[in-house]
Amino acid sequence: MSSASIQSNKTSNIHNESIDKQMEAKAHETAQNTDLKNEARSLFDNATKSIGRLAGNDESLNLNLKDMFSEVFKPHTKNEADEIFIAGTAKTTPAICDISEEWGKPWLFSRVFIAFTVTFIALWVMAAVFNNTNAIPGLIFIGALTVPLSGLFFFYESNAFKNISIFEVIIMFFIGGVFSLLSTMVLYRFVVFSDQFERFGSLTFFDAFLVGLVEETGKALIIVYFVNKLKTNKILNGLLIGASIGAGFAVFESAGYILNFALGENVPLLDIVFTRAWTAIGGHLVWSAIVGAAIVIAKEQRGFEFKDIFDKRFLIFFLSAVGLHGIWDTSLTILGSDTLKIFILIVVVWILVFILMGAGLKQVNLLQKEFKDQQNKIQE
């Protein structure tokens, strides 16, 4: 064999060994990534299972968002929309045995969002293009209303029991929203903020969590009233009732913030509207929904009483809402970004909401079993 052939074989062997090492390294890296993914999934499952257990559900959160929102992009008829809107009356509330325990596929909320967005754009054209200042109040109100009300319709559609009418939701939204603001204003008279806030208007960490505690308590008082009034023991109802009050609170608060910032801070109106709009998806709407579910979980079959505030289940969910609210209001950032902080808080709060929704659907199954047992006893 010539020296050239020997050299060629050596080069080939070295090349093959290099490829083998690269493949081994890639396989090792893939295995590590798979292990990390499995560990993260296991951690998520254990965490959601532990939280869900407080609400009566021993299963981990297993939700396919793509499937859940699959109806959003499909065409729907007016009759389909009407069927959703007429839910909750004596004639349209389904029997417990006819309720599905599967995850719902809401879609009407997206049409509500589109309708309000079109309205907002038309008002903006009136104000910006035609210099019509009469459109500005409408621009502020619709800007504040669009996301909270669309989100509220999501909770309305997700109420598998379909036992709360749109009329009751509107009452809770307007009356509950205003009175939750009023109760919050009363509670603020009994708290003292730091000198830093009093002098410069900036919140310390303690101030921020105090704001969360006061506002979630103010809303909780009104949520308790409506939960007891409707005499419900269903978690999905608690989510809807809480979301109704929270959405109303958010709309009136945001409208005030938009007006004050636009007039007093020299900030462009649209900037404030868009900021309040996209952040509303993770604010009062969902914090109050969690509190509403917590109230229902703690009270069980009777009305909510003062002693129920010491129930471990209520305290954990209520303080979770307070904590998320407090962190939201702090000057804390993640990697120097306040937007990233808000985004992470939105993800966390919706995970909690979906855990509670899962517990609510599990409750459907339990109530159906209770109903069947009662029917069997009657027949015996």
Regions found by a protein language model. Give the residues of each.
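Hydrophobic alpha-helical segments at protein termini of multi-pass membrane proteins
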Residues: 2-380
